[in-house]
Amino acid sequence: GAKSSKTELLGVSSVAGNYPIEITTKNVLKTLELIGRPDIPVAKGMHKPLTRPLPNDPFSHGSDGMGEIFLPEPTTKISNKHGVDQIIDVVRANPGEVTVICIAPLTNLAMAIMKEPQLVEEVKEVVCLAGSFGLNRYAFENATGDNPQAEWNVYVDPEAAKLVFNSGIPLRAIGLDVATCTNLDKNQLYSLKNSSRKEANIVEKMVRYLERRGHESYCVLIDSMAVAAVLEPSLIEMIEVRVGIETKGELTLGQTIADFRKHHAWEHLPKIKVALKANYKRFIDVLMENILR
């Protein structure tokens, strides 16, 4: 997205998720320096979920949080603003024009909405990698929360996800059930490895790290699908459905419960758009075009 001519990345707010806030913030800076965009403002956001301690991620991304690629230490400084305030200020400066892409727990956005409730009327839309909605056989096979039903971003801060989903903000959720159905093939990995572009080489290294740990390349693609849904909305077919977030379940904390019933549906649940299916070939083409160009 930062390199796309179709969009303008106005800022990044880090948040505690797979790793503590200091590591995630540093990794944002490293990534922006890697792609030659150190000018994009980075603000450090929430260091813990709204009401819970930050859980340890059972799916390790290596000691650096990026698949053991060990990018150089960043020289760019973070913004003086808090990550929550950066969201508020950017949206306020561009009412009706800003899409907020969330590829981490929704803590920052939830805090922004609590601080400035009017924000829900000013954001163009939210597109998030969040949940799993039971729409194919992969729905819970690749669950990333610390239980068989939850996706990590919602599991980490289910209260934040519930607040955002219930806020009335225009929202598209890309679930794991749709996002985990595609991988890079050998030819694509070869192109990345042999590219003259450093960022392409880095993506290939990330995939190789995952393969050594017994995982597939979709693990580095799922967040990209949320970005691709903004760059090219026709890539992903959405369906509107009522969705609830489990915040109290002993075995199902963080589960996103989609109510598809025609009769006796839970009318109190918010209606949101969730991914039904994707054009995976086109998604990979868009991804490769953006990495290799």
Regions found by a protein language model. Name each.
Residues 51-58, 75-78, 127-130, 173, ...:
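Short, functional N-terminal and low-complexity linear motifs
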Residues 33-38, 47, 92-96, 114-118, ...:
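Generic secondary-structure signature for well-ordered alpha-helical cores
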